[in-house]
Swiss-Prot record:
Keywords: Ribonucleoprotein, Ribosomal protein. It comes from Gallus gallus (Chicken). GO terms for molecular function: structural constituent of ribosome. GO terms for cellular component: cytosolic large ribosomal subunit. Belongs to the eukaryotic ribosomal protein eL39 family. It comes from the Eukaryota. Interacts with IMPACT. One of its GO terms (biological process) is translation. This is Large ribosomal subunit protein eL39. Pfam families: Ribosomal_L39 (PF00832).
């Protein structure tokens, strides 16, 4: 990844960074909740973004 990024790329990376977090604990506590963890987590070394 270059140090000089276009705004489009930077915005894309920012979105992916926001998506890549665990689910909040209060969501797990909700009644009738079936979500245990965020299945769409991405590890920076294992799975690369399609850039």
């Amino acid at each position: 990844m270059s140090s000089h990024k276009t705004f489009k790329i930077k915005r894309f990376l920012a979105k992916k960074q926001k998506q890549n977090r665990p689910i909040p604990q209060w969501i797990r506590m909700k009644t009738g909740n079936k979500i245990r963890y965020n299945s769409k987590r991405r590890h920076w070394r294992r799975t690369k973004l399609g850039l």
